[in-house]
Swiss-Prot record:
Source species: Schizosaccharomyces pombe (strain 972 / ATCC 24843) (Fission yeast)
Function field: Component of the ribosome, a large ribonucleoprotein complex responsible for the synthesis of proteins in the cell. The small ribosomal subunit (SSU) binds messenger RNAs (mRNAs) and translates the encoded message by selecting cognate aminoacyl-transfer RNA (tRNA) molecules. The large subunit (LSU) contains the ribosomal catalytic site termed the peptidyl transferase center (PTC), which catalyzes the formation of peptide bonds, thereby polymerizing the amino acids delivered by tRNAs into a polypeptide chain.
Name the UniProt record assigns to this protein: Small ribosomal subunit protein uS8A
NCBIfam families: PRK04034.1
Family stated for the protein in its record: Belongs to the universal ribosomal protein uS8 family.
UniProt entry keywords in alphabetical sequence: Cytoplasm, Nucleus, Ribonucleoprotein, Ribosomal protein
Ribosomal protein keyword on record: yes
One GO CC annotation: cytosolic small ribosomal subunit
Gene for this chain: rps2201
Amino acid sequence: MVRQSVLADCLNNIVNAERRGRRQVLIRPSSKVIVKFLTVMQKHGYIDEFTEIDDHRSGKIVIQLNGRINKCGVISPRFNVKLKDIEKWVNQLLPSRQVGVIVLTTSRGIMSHNEARAKDAGGKILGFFY
């Protein structure tokens, strides 16, 4: 299997586990970007909790699922998004304004599109989930 992106593989594993009705999923390898992305998902209530396991290699993450994820994905290439253009991407990627989150990486860290609006920060789109 050819690994395209560590984050893309992680989100794909999460969606597949949700569709199968699993309560937890094991992700490997681990990375800082995946951990920050999962933190945003946890903050918005789409996953219950996750724990990092250090195996002295690339690391593992065990995620406890709660059944709220319908779809999540990575946007590749990571397009630059100005503050005024965030609304356009919300309309393209999410089913509704009230449902779902777009995750951005900004100079102030990885955050949701609502946080980026509040902090007046643009950045690059990492992915989305709803």
